[in-house]
Amino acid sequence: VTDSDRLVVWLRETLDAAQADAEAATSGPWHVTEYVAGSDYGFDAGVGTAPGEVDVVGHGYEGGGCERVQDARHIVRHNPANVLRRIAADRKLLDLHRDDLGKCAECGQGYELMDWGPDFPCATVRLLAEGWGWTEGEQA
């Protein structure tokens, strides 16, 4: 197994795991419910599937709650639908930038001889993997 193969296998497995998590999560859209400062909840915000609901990240006494509104907004921005859309786009990029005899099929377009094109994995594939947590240590 080459380093290129290892990176692509790792990336596809990572995308599969993220997709499974997103598909199993509470579907959205998600909304932030901000609590009045000093409320009995002990938290600044909750996250729910409708405005005013907190069925994703509940009140403090329900074992949930976000201590900061910014955390709740971040959670909402990464709801399952958004994650699935990004995964689908990343898979399309990975399919375009595929290995073609050791060169990137997409980046190598325009080269008469493929042996002059960029090596695979190209910068696009390496950056995709980096965005999902790949480090040089993963290659060991």
Model-predicted segments: where are they?
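Exposed alpha-helical structural elements
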Residues: 6, 10, 14-17, 70-74, ...
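Generic preference for well-ordered secondary structure
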Residues: 2, 14, 59-62, 67, ...
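Compositionally biased, intrinsically disordered low-complexity segments enriched
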Residues: 33-37, 61, 99
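Short intrinsically disordered terminal tails
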Residues: 1-10, 27, 99-140
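A short, structured beta-strand/loop element
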Residues: 41-82, 88, 106
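Aromatic-glycine hotspot motif
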Residues: 2-51, 91
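Amphipathic alpha-helical oligomerization segments
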Residues: 17-32, 78-113
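Residues in flexible loops and secondary-structure boundaries
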Residues: 38-40, 64, 91, 101-102, ...
